């Protein structure tokens, strides 16, 4: 017997960036697989059907940290909560002692705290986890030597904008330059990493920018099956070492 078709809007809120909504639905083209989606206005921001690159952001950053000699009691900050897969993947590594996620949209944080999303219970209840309502970009590039409580961290992972040149909010563009990246770098320990997810292929110009700030930069292409196109989609992950 086929599973029943589901389409439900779980929440709808107004935010400074526009109207944001969370919905869950079954996908009849995928045997009624249950998926969760977030829309901002008329734009689809994210889907639980495509989370491979978000997970790889954490996995690749933690792998590089360990190669750099940081293998326990890791302190990780994630910019952008979304559906929570970058944050959850960090928590799945027991070398991570503390993982704080900053998101400018309170409704997104509330979805996890209320258990509306599959990973929300873990993110809201794990003692190593903290969800913070705030502007990641303001926090990351202020004049202090640390981040949140003036403390340097092992990794800062960013999953907010579509790419370094395609921003969720025009104001975010001021982060992707030498001065801002250098300010953020001061908040990361030696041998620590900055990781960035992008919905696009690696951008050589952004890699050059990272090379001017960090000691080592990696570009990773993450490909995954796209059942809608019948082919593969490609995201990318940048990992830069302090």
Regions found by a protein language model. Give the residues of each.
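Rossmann-like AdoMet
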Residues: 1-64, 92
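Class I S-adenosyl-L-methionine
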Residues: 14, 200-242
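A short, structural micro-pattern
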Residues: 16, 32, 103, 231-234
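A broad, low-specificity signal marking well-ordered, structured residues that form hydrophobic/aromatic
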Residues: 20, 36, 129, 237-238
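Histidine- and/or cysteine-centered catalytic micro-motif in compact active-site loops
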Residues: 43, 161, 199
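Loop/helix-junction capping segments adjacent to catalytic residues or to phosphate/diphosphate-binding pockets
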Residues: 47, 84, 204
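The AdoMet/dcAdoMet-binding core of the Class I SAM-like
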Residues: 51-187, 217-223, 229-231
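Conserved beta-strand signature within the Rossmann-like core of class I S-adenosyl-L-methionine
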Residues: 191-198
């Amino acid at each position: 017997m086929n599973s029943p078709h589901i389409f439900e809007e779980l929440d709808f809120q107004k935010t400074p960036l526009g109207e944001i909504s969370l919905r869950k639905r079954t996908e009849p083209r995928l045997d009624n697989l249950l998926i969760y989606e977030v829309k901002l206005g008329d734009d689809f921001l994210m889907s639980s059907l495509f989370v491979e690159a978000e997970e790889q952001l954490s996995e690749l950053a933690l792998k590089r940290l360990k190669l750099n000699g940081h293998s326990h009691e890791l302190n990780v900050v994630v910019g952008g909560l979304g559906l929570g897969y970058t944050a959850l993947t960090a928590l799945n590594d027991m070398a991570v002692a503390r993982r704080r996620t900053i998101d400018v949209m309170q409704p997104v944080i509330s979805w996890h705290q209320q258990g509306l999303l599959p990973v929300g219970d873990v993110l809201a209840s794990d003692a190593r986890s903290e969800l913070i309502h705030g502007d990641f970009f303001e926090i990351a590039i202020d004049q202090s030597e640390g981040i949140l409580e003036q403390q340097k961290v092992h990794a800062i992972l960013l999953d907010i904008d579509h790419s370094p040149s395609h921003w969720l909010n025009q104001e975010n563009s001021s982060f992707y330059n030498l001065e801002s990246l250098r300010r953020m770098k001061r908040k990361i320990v030696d041998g620590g990493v900055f990781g960035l997810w992008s919905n696009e292929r690696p951008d050589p110009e952004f890699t050059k920018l990272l090379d001017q700030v960090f000691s080592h930069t990696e570009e990773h292409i993450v490909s995954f099956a796209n059942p809608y196109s019948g082919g593969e989609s490609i995201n990318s992950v940048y990992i830069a070492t302090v």
